[in-house]
């Protein structure tokens, strides 16, 4: 296994079978020790959040599979906080899919004129954005 990329919340490794291993970390985006899902830097560590994020990812990949939608997901190991995926060629720096259940972080910075911080987003709000390296 060879480290090929270190991200804010995951490290990416190449595997001998040409697949890719994602190692979910307990690091969170935020600022000055305060969690903020819209921040572009690591601001704190929360023990167990890597595994929680992996469990959430598995859930959504399984829903996609059940709906007959193909993905790059191969398998996961919750104890090790790892996910094996097929290699993929990304557009630019990749696409980010964000599911928000509460209005906070960058969502409030963009839409705070219309909604209060902490407001539950009934049914969730999903947005797709291009990743930037800013």
Segments predicted by a language model, with ranges:
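Active-site loop/lid in soluble adenylation, ligation, and acyl-transfer enzymes
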Residues: 1-133
């Amino acid at each position: 296994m060879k480290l090929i990329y270190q991200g804010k919340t995951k490290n990416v490794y190449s595997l001998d079978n040409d697949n890719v291993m994602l190692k979910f970390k307990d690091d969170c985006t935020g600022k000055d020790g305060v969690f903020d899902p819209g921040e572009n830097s690591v601001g704190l560590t929360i023990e167990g959040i890597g595994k929680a994020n992996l469990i959430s990812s598995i859930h959504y990949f399984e829903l996609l599979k059940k709906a007959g939608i193909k993905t790059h997901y191969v398998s996961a190991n919750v104890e090790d906080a790892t996910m094996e995926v097929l290699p993929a060629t990304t557009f630019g720096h990749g696409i980010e899919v964000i599911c928000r259940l509460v209005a906070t972080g960058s969502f409030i910075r963009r839409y705070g004129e219309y909604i209060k911080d902490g407001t539950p987003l009934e049914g969730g709000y999903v947005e797709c954005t291009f990743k930037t390296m800013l």
